[in-house]
Amino acid sequence: MSNNEFHQRRLSATPRGVGVMCNFFAQSAENATLKDVEGNEYIDFAAGIAVLNTGHRHPDLVAAVEQQLQQFTHTAYQIVPYESYVTLAEKINALAPVSGQAKTAFFTTGAEAVENAVKIARAHTGRPGVIAFSGGFHGRTYMTMALTGKVAPYKIGFGPFPGSVYHVPYPSDLHGISTQDSLDAIERLFKSDIEAKQVAAIIFEPVQGEGGFNVAPKELVAAIRRLCDEHGIVMIADEVQSGFARTGKLFAMDHYADKPDLMTMAKSLAGGMPLSGVVGNANIMDAPAPGGLGGTYAGNPLAVAAAHVVLNIIDKESLCERANQLGQRLKNTLIDAKESVPAIAAVRGLGSMIAAEFNDPQTGKPSAAIAQKIQQRALAQGLLLLTCGAYGNVIRFLYPLTIPDAQFDAAMKILQDELSD
């Protein structure tokens, strides 16, 4: 059956709200290569939206999941617990850069992790308010939609949203927003909208994902830490997209001296299996009463088995170092192109969490059309890219960190050709 035939079936069988970017259907995948039902091959620089830092079907991961399949697939951890969940929590506790002794709880999706981080913060503080940042993305459930700082397409027609959620600008040199602007906005909130002692949490992405890979300045993170300490507010770092070697360190927060109280994680945690988590200060994590946290599939044993292997792969294959090496090569390609491509307004990121932002050279305004044109032309040449950003004018690069050098070089050649065309 052809891609077009599957496409027609999709239109009839699934709602339009489940938007689909590609007009082809996956048949198989291995490492950084994706093959469709017609045999066409693509270099995958989307990786299921940052889920596959260890590549499609890493042999070690496949073996671990197969082994777990032979034992048991589900008990519901809250009913019958299992050792692998506890051991994974111990590993994350030892690795995560959070304040004090750590504890970890596992869930299923990134949105679920963020929801539970907010629950934990509210339980700990007894306060309702949450401050988030414009351009941030935290999920598609009602609380996480409220936290998300982008309207289209995530919020259209779905309101009203939960209350006691407030937004402040995220720093951006390109768009003229300084760290001081962000901090002044928080202080204005305290004066005009919600008193500081009613704020449970401040949540931020150290590198914004959907927002366009804007990197939080160290001064901002330090100031958030000071504000949280001063007012008894829980500091939450959302590492759903930035975690597990993507930024050249295991977590993006490893780039900063200041530690959050809670961190959320998901996506590449289990290499394609659905698993998320919240790790944080043990005193804060223990605030909810027994039974207050959990979920039927939370910490599923198949996904937990995969996560154990992901941590091993990152260490064994030096993927943090690999992320820095590949990211520098990508940055060099983009910076070189910027000299002759005036539409490239900025190149930014950490490690292999790199993005390029595009403006109309004539007006200087954000141009989603230019980003989409490059994306579509690259796809026609077999390179799968994603766009993002508040204006849809950013191309983000999320290749598996296990991609072979020759394949990465081939992708760079396609990118160079399409940027200069």
Which role does the model predict for each range below?
Residues M1-D421:
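Conserved N-terminal phosphate-binding loop of PLP-dependent enzymes in the Aspartate aminotransferase
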